[in-house]
Amino acid sequence: MSELTTTHEWNNLPWRKLERKVFKLQKRIYQASSRGDTETVRNLQRLLINSWSAKCIAVRRVTQDNQGKKTAGVDGVKSLSPEARLKLAKQLRITGKSKPTLRVWIPKPGKDEKRPLGIPTIHDRALQALVKIALEPEWEAKFEPNSYGFRPGRSTHDAIEAVFKGVKSKEKFILDADIAKCFDKINHYVLLKKLNTFPSLSRQIKAWLKSGVMDGKELFPTQEGTPQGGVISPLLANVALHGLETLITNKFKRLSTGQNKRTAAILVRYADDFVVIHEHLSVIEQSKQLISQWLSNLGLELKESKTKIVSSKTGFDFLGFNIKQYSVSDNHSSRNTKGEILGFKTLIKPSDESIKRVYEQLRDTIDRYGTSPQVALIKKLNPIIKGWANYYSTVCSTDTYNDLDSLLYNKLQQWARRRHSKKTNGWVAIKYWHVNEGKWDFRAEEDEKRISLLKFYKTKINRHIKVQGSRSPFDGDWIYWSSRMGRSPEISKKVAKLLKEQQGKCGHCGNYFDTDSVMEIHHVDGNHKNNKTENLQL
């Protein structure tokens, strides 16, 4: 078979049909798991793992859709041709074997230290994606409602809304917890026992966990932990930590009668980051002890130096946001469910650390582009501004946006003056800035087209609507899930508008977009300069 033929064959696979087949089985697994029918779950998982449809989708996800697709493991393979993708899909099967992962060190955001990733080979990544396709719907039916990290259809914004609902009506105490080296320390035996899957799959997962890691030319054994960098690792970590919320909510239930009236304790978790919320300090202190005991069974422990108990009046940071109750006048105060004035207002804002980090990123970019054309600098800064502003567009960010715009303006003035040290400030201003709607616009021209620097303050604030309870995309309610995708703060306005116009469906295959979909904007007439809405399609 020639390479041209196999390229054509891979690119022209009936992807719409394959995705529908896979989702139908996933939906059945989710339903069987929801009703506790383990035998049906296992039979359907075997069927899915051996299906050609799932194998093709698994290969596509790790070789085409995944952002880290061009990272090599110990095999040295960074990318695959369509011919090789087809070959890999045909080879995928559960063998109970695994090659070591490759240790790659990446910087921690905003810190000088680095954290290790364990990158599997491209074959192991594809096989892990296949296993995840089968395991995820089973566990989505089991996972607790206030678990939000690395789950389809859930985000940091859902977690923050859950925290807001927990603290908005009364002063609360918060256990702000940090698990020490969570991914690196999880006990393999306890994890595999908790997974409780069929023997051949259990052996395969054990092989991945025990595969070892190559650091340089030296192989290190892995007796504990799940390697960060594996496709299946976040799911395994969620399985390991499943039950933590139930532990707290069962122990500290709502009491509506008697002398010891109290509300229920709330635990909100995003992967290994979590907070416990309650009105009584004693409940929070007991929660900490209870959680420490529970974690010890997994081989984990709380990091004392980073675990603290705080009040909602003093505020706390969680997932890059700051949550705090501010004392305000009666006119601006929140009210409880009885309509009584509380004397405070709970506000969520970007955390100081996150503000500092984005400004440093902008500042360093400007410094690096000291002698570059203005257009090049604008093109480099705009994605940073847009991404950060969109992420924080669901909370009280207006003041922060204005502050960042002011800091950025001052930094750009320094940049411009350094380039023309012998010119007057007025000359520099006219060269690089233009007045637009009464405000200075940092703007340049390229191919007779104006390119302006984005402004933080122009980002519209829209409150995020939290995902409902324990809902999952595997429940098959396409209308609900596609409408949520269109409201996500992490997608651009243009994509959101097209999603709404296309009613959540792909313009090419007609399938509904799901949470794993990579959405790309296509120009209908092939003219990439024609960006009119009617010429764009997702």
Residue ranges of each PLM-predicted region?
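Short cysteine-rich loop/turn motifs with clustered Cys
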Residues: 491-519
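Reverse-transcriptase-like RNA-dependent polymerase core
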Residues: 61, 89-113, 122, 126-135, ...
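Charged boundary/loop elements
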Residues: 8-68, 133-149
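Extended C-terminal regions of large enzymes
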Residues: 405-494
